[in-house]
Design a protein with these regions (language model features):
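Long, contiguous internal "core" modules enriched in hydrophobic/ aromatic residues
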Residues: 1-329, 337
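Low-complexity, charge- and small-residue-enriched intrinsically disordered regions
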Residues: 336-343
Length: 343
């Protein structure tokens, strides 16, 4: 049985394991508000002395280092969440537009089973994917007592797809796209990527569907508060020459499990979307890493490895980010001085 330890005892346990506490009051606050398990168990693996049989922290390691890693990961998690919300909006809009344009705005038309592929058999629900999704959507359309569904039932006597799909999850949307037939699936991929249907290759289409699963995995991880920077999704991208060349992952790297299911691959998968809001949000992760790196200068190597980032690319990106902010600060100061003298 795991015994209870109050906050002061938790701090003493850490000190007995060779961890330095620079500010006991701040440490007590962190443990009270975020929890021992979240901060210590979540990130201690990166600061432990692997040569010791008993759990011992490396010399001169601090509790503040653990908290900084925790805060960095929390910032990455929040950005992943925001980025996937942008992707979800693009997917939902494209799906609703395609169904309305091709099948109409009445549920009896755009929720007609004949218009979709069966999909995989889901043993949990004892139904094919198509039947489970369509039954769920019909039930939402008929019975869910929320706005704007209520208003549309009363005023318009039907619920168009752009209203109905507001009530679905990213997982529902992803699975619904998978059961679409060729023309509708191609249209959605075209709308999301900005490529015309004639430009899309079979490889482009396959990559897009795989990317949806990767995005969903990272979204679920973020939503449940899991550690992000070393997360490896259970779903992996196949090797796609154009995509992997673009993100500087060689076939050899791929065989060594790079460019499959890590944070670096997830970052760049969002660049496939014409709406770059999600991808741009994730670039703010570099700012968070840069801020952490200012205090813990060797951690970027650990982060590069855990995130699946090629070391030279992360180093270049961080340097570019430093120069951007340095130049931005000088530019801001120069304009402020000019404004003073121009008054």
């Amino acid at each position: 049985m795991k015994p209870f330890s109050d906050f002061n005892k938790q701090i003493k346990i850490l000190e007995n394991r060779n961890l330095t506490i620079l500010d006991r009051k701040a440490a007590n606050f962190a443990l009270r508000n975020y929890g021992y398990y979240e901060i210590v168990n979540g990130y201690k693996i990166f600061l432990l002395d692997s040569s010791k049989k008993v759990e011992t922290f490396l010399e001169k390691e601090t509790f503040e280092h653990l908290v900084s890693l925790y805060n960095l990961d929390k910032q990455i998690r929040n950005l992943v969440m925001q980025a996937t919300l942008e992707v979800e909006l693009s997917l939902r809009t494209s799906l609703a537009y395609t169904l309305a344009e091709d099948f109409g705005v009445l549920e009896s038309d755009y929720l007609d089973r004949k218009k979709y592929k069966k999909g995989k058999f889901q043993h949990k629900h004892k139904k094919y994917q198509r039947d489970f999704l369509l039954d769920m959507l019909k039930d939402i359309a008929a019975n869910r007592p929320v706005e704007p569904l209520n208003s549309y039932r009363i005023k318009h006597k039907h619920i168009p797809p752009w209203i109905l799909f507001k009530e679905t999850t990213l997982g529902n949307i992803t699975n619904f796209i998978k059961i679409l037939k060729g023309p509708q699936k191609d249209k959605i991929i075209s709308l999301c990527t900005g490529l015309s249907s004639s430009q899309l290759t079979p490889a482009d289409k396959a990559l897009f569907i795989e990317v949806l699963d990767l995005i969903l995995a990272f979204r679920n991880r973020a939503a449940h508060g899991g550690r992000m920077f070393n997360y490896k999704a259970s779903t992996s991208l196949s090797y796609h020459q154009n995509f992997h060349n673009e993100i500087k992952i060689t076939p050899g790297d791929y065989r060594n499990n790079k460019g499959k299911n890590d944070l670096y691959t997830f970052f760049h998968s969002l660049a496939l979307f014409e709406n770059k809001a999600g991808f741009d949000l994730l670039q703010l992760c570099l700012y968070s890493i840069k801020e952490h790196d200012a205090s813990y200068t060797k951690d970027w190597l650990v982060l590069a490895k855990e995130m699946g980032y090629p070391e030279y690319i992360l180093k270049t990106d961080l340097e570019r980010h430093r120069n951007f902010h340095k130049n931005y600060r000088w530019s801001y100061l120069w304009h402020a001085i000019k404004n003073i003298f121009n008054k």
